[in-house]
């Protein structure tokens, strides 16, 4: 134990089942699918699960066999592929959560560079979990593009068709608040950092949250 944190090196699936957790962050190399069942079972009655997926070829539709095998879904490589990738991952999480009587509520979701990153709130509720598929559907590629409960024509999915963000949380993620929380104190910066290094660090923080608060209502609709 160091600074109140217990560090353990071992099999993640085994470790996650040894105690209930209120917060789990899955960030494996490649697909997180093999860890989801253990992680979701390990979340307390109410808890946060964060998941990163770097197998974007499967999620974005260019590796269709892998997508079908891992996610039970299919994508299309077009202007919607990044949104599809995010929603396909959320759909799988929602399905596995429902298997364990838990409902999923997205907090934040993004596609950045070569990975998908989602944060979700999980709550134990048989009633809500029973209706998990109300937000599962397909993106139909016919004008106007739209979500539908059943596939037809050219489509991607199945995927999560509900909100991607929690508007209340995302609406508070302003650049000013991010700098306040994440920039740290000057005394904590490495001694060899110049003024340029500090400014670069702050710009990266700004970039990570830019437009989120302004888009909160749209993305939570």
Listing of model-derived features with the role each one plays in the protein:
Residues 1-221:
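SAM-dependent transferase fold signal centered on methyltransferase-like domains
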């Amino acid at each position: 134990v160091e600074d109140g944190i217990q560090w353990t090196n071992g099999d993640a699936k085994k470790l996650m089942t040894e105690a209930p957790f209120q917060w789990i962050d899955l960030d494996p190399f490649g697909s997180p699918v093999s860890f989801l069942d253990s992680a979701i079972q390990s979340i307390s009655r109410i808890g946060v699960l964060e998941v990163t997926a770097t197998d974007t070829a499967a999620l974005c539709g260019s590796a269709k066999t892998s997508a079908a095998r891992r996610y039970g879904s299919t994508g299309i490589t077009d202007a919607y592929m990044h949104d599809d990738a995010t929603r396909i991952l959320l759909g799988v999480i929602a399905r596995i959560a429902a298997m364990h009587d838990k409902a999923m509520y997205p907090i934040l979701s993004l596609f950045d560079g070569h990975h998908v990153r989602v944060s979700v709130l999980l709550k134990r509720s048989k009633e809500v979990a029973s209706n998990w598929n109300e937000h599962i559907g397909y993106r139909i590629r016919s004008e106007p593009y739209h979500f539908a409960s059943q596939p037809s024509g050219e489509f991607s999915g199945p995927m999560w068709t509900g909100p991607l963000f929690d508007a209340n949380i995302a609406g508070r993620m302003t650049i000013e608040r991010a700098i306040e929380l994440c920039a740290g104190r000057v005394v904590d910066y490495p001694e060899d950092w110049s003024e340029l290094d500090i400014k670069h660090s702050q710009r990266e923080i700004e970039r990570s949250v830019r437009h989120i608060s302004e888009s909160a209502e749209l993305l939570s609709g």
